[in-house]
Amino acid sequence: MEINRSYPCNPGNYAVMDDKVNKYIVIHYVGATGSALQNAQYFERLPSIGASAHFFVGHASEGGTIYQSVDPKDRAWHCGAKVYRHPDCRNANSIGIEMCCHKDAQGNWYFDDETVEQTVQLVKQLMAEYNVPIDNVVRHYDVTGKLCPAPLVDEFAWLLFKQRLEVPAMGEKTGDNPSSWAVDHTEWAKAKGIIYGDGQGNYDWQGPVTREAMAAMLHNFAIAYGLEKED
């Protein structure tokens, strides 16, 4: 994963640490319509803002570019408060990720799909690097009660986001044995010629499905049921 580190945060906006242990990853939204680049440059340029984040994840228009503002080994000021909802998550033991956002005509905040996908991949990388369990990926809302990140304060939206963290990243090894509930379905798909393996008996049943793989499966389905002739 490419991360742009060209705009380090002004030293006046975070605290250097020697022994930080990252136990949590905290998800935020920027709360304005600026780009990740603009945010990274803002925190680089101005001292004494009293706030910071480790990463900014950009809009689709900037390719979902990720900017590292503060090194995860240092303490960014992203979830501090006088009163906390969370019993343990603090600036001193967490990594803060800010997602860039948009506001619609009704005043509702939302994320580009690419911003969400890039955030998911970044979180998964950080989870692996710092051994952070999925239960310790939290919202700013969970830590302090602040309505942040606004598009993910809704519990169902947050559940969907968390579920994406459980899907193996592209290139990650996955189990080739289907889940017990799916055995009949997978055997049927193999028998009908809808899903093909790699020629060595491997089907990667629990791997992620790309759009091109889905297109191939639909095409095979059409051929298997005579909806289209095989070339």
Regions found by a protein language model. Name each.
Residues M1-P8, Y14-D19, I25, D88, ...:
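Basic/polar, cationic surfaces and motifs that engage anionic cell-wall
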Residues T33, F43-L46, G58, P72, ...:
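Structured segments of extracytoplasmic/periplasmic soluble domains
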Residues A92-S94, Q200:
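Short, solvent-exposed beta-strand edge segments and adjacent coil->beta transition regions
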